[in-house]
Each structure stands twice: as structure tokens, then as C-alpha cells.
Amino acid sequence: MPELPEVETSRLGITPHLQGQTIKAIVVRTDKLRWPIPQELQKLVGQRVQSIRRRAKYLMIDTPKGSAIIHLGMSGSLRVLDEEVPSAKHDHVDLVLENGKVLRYNDPRKFGAWLYSEVGVAHQVLSKLGPEPLTNEFNSEYFAEKAKNKKTVVKQFIMNNAVVVGVGNIYASESLFMAQIHPKTSVGSLKASQITLLVAEIKKVLETAIKQGGTTLKDFNQVDGKPGYFAQELHVYGRAKKKCLLCSSIIQEEKIGQRNTFWCGHCQPFNK
């Protein structure tokens, strides 16, 4: 599943091709993805793209008339192609530009979304979201206040979009490993020093992943078709039964909140 670094990589990749260009057409080949694709998207035809923003794992293509909101779901991807390139299987939406380029959305599982938002109106999917992890708003003081007296396990806590957005399964496991915190630790029991370290590691892991172009496991490739290289940096995720790169202990795996979770029992001891 594309997570924050993959979505940010997509944003960085499409921005030079879209910003300042005029939308000539929006071609919808599948009328429903995760939700029905709204007819209001056609209001963007003839509009100039002002900016491409990201909020959590949503991309917003902004025009003076309104915005297209895109979520990549489990297997979605965006490619910038020449308009004459024929569509392929699972190519569900084209945003056609007057410069002869097309932003093409491919999604085999159809769990993604294309939505529409009027200017100045916050779409409901963007409400109740926590701060962006790479902003100053997400800091140890904020984390400590949110975690106070909570019995939730720390991995589920940092994956809660109401607490902080964009810390998906891969990066939650990696951040906890780097902070040497067991994923099943009660978040309310964390010491101030652990919180400070965890916040710093979340930021560092995400920043590194963005620089590497995200993580390619099954479905994600960059806009230019190249893989993301953060998979080469993974310490625990997807490495069950392999040796820890730091201490040579065996990496453990267990489902936490229905998500596969990985950790090193030596580097991340579980203190009940």
C-alpha cells in the first residue's frame, strides 16, 4: 500500500508536469473506485492547475474552480504519459492536459479514490486528521499529551490518523525499531526520553524514505516507473525469521491490529 513517502514521491514527480498547465479533459473509464467518481470533477476542465498538495495520503490538484482529491488506495499509481499512449487494463482515470501530456491513474484493486472539492470547502475525508509528521506541530510535547493515560499499544497509536497522519505499517515498524521500542508497549507507559526519540525517528525514517523515492514491495513505483529504493533500507519490515542487522537476533512477526508487525526481541525488549 502506498504510504506517506510514496504519496509525497508521487506529488514531487507529477508537479513539474502539471503545475501551470490547463486541463483539457478528464476521462473516467470506471465510474466507481472505493467510492463513486463524482461528475463534479468535470468542472475542472478548462481550468489551470495552480498547485499540487498532499494532506496525509491524499493528493489535491488545485485549480481556481476547485480541486481533484486523489487517494492511491492499496495499489493505485500515477504516471505522466504522452496523450497518444493507449490506455491499459486498470487505467481508470486520465487527466488530460493541453500540452499533450496525460496524468493516468492505474489501480488494479480499485480501492483508491478520485473526489472533488469546491474552493474553500474542506472535504469530509480531510476532516479530523492529525498533524503532518514532518511539521513542527508534531513534537514530543504534543505526543506526550495525546498519549497521556492511554493503554493503546504504541504501534496502533502512531498509525492512528487522528493522532498523526501518514505513519503507515512499514514506517511504524521501522520507526519503533530505530527508537528501540517494542510495538506492543502501552503508549501511556512511555518515558519522556522514549517519546522524544520516537518522534525524532518517525521524522527521520519518513524523510529518508522520501529521499529514496519510497518503498517498492508489490504495487508501488514512482511516476517515472522506477522503483522506490527505501526497501533496501528496511531493518525489520518484511524480514521475519531473518537476523537483525544490528544484533543478529531473529526478527519476530505478529499481527497487531490486523497488521503484520515486525521487531527485534533483543533490540526492542517488551517490558510489561
UniProtKB/Swiss-Prot annotation:
The cross-references to InterPro entries, in alphabetical order and at most eight, read: DNA_glyclase/AP_lyase_DNA-bd, DNA_glyclase_Znf_dom_DNA_BS, Formamido-pyr_DNA_Glyclase, FPG_cat, MutM-like_N-ter, Ribosomal_uS13-like_H2TH, Znf_DNA_glyclase/AP_lyase, Znf_FPG/IleRS
- Could you tell me which CDD domains the record lists for this protein? EcFpg-like_N
Write down the chemical reaction(s) this protein catalyses: Hydrolysis of DNA containing ring-opened 7-methylguanine residues, releasing 2,6-diamino-4-hydroxy-5-(N-methyl)formamidopyrimidine; 2'-deoxyribonucleotide-(2'-deoxyribose 5'-phosphate)-2'-deoxyribonucleotide-DNA = a 3'-end 2'-deoxyribonucleotide-(2,3-dehydro-2,3-deoxyribose 5'-phosphate)-DNA + a 5'-end 5'-phospho-2'-deoxyribonucleoside-DNA + H(+)
Instruction: Give the transmembrane ranges.
Output: none
Q: Which residues bind DNA?
A: 90, 109, 150
User: What's one GO MF term for it?
Assistant: zinc ion binding
EC number(s) of the enzyme?
3.2.2.23, 4.2.99.18
Q: FPG-type zinc finger positions in the chain?
A: 235-269
In which family does this protein belong, per the annotation? Answer: Belongs to the FPG family.
The UniProt subunit note reads as follows: Monomer.
Q: Tell me, what does this protein do in biology?
A: Involved in base excision repair of DNA damaged by oxidation or by mutagenic agents. Acts as a DNA glycosylase that recognizes and removes damaged bases. Has a preference for oxidized purines, such as 7,8-dihydro-8-oxoguanine (8-oxoG). Has AP (apurinic/apyrimidinic) lyase activity and introduces nicks in the DNA strand. Cleaves the DNA backbone by beta-delta elimination to generate a single-strand break at the site of the removed base with both 3'- and 5'-phosphates.
- What HAMAP family does the annotation carry? Fapy_DNA_glycosyl
Provide the protein name: Formamidopyrimidine-DNA glycosylase
User: Which organism encodes this protein?
Assistant: Aliivibrio fischeri (strain ATCC 700601 / ES114) (Vibrio fischeri)
**What is this protein's gene name?**
mutM
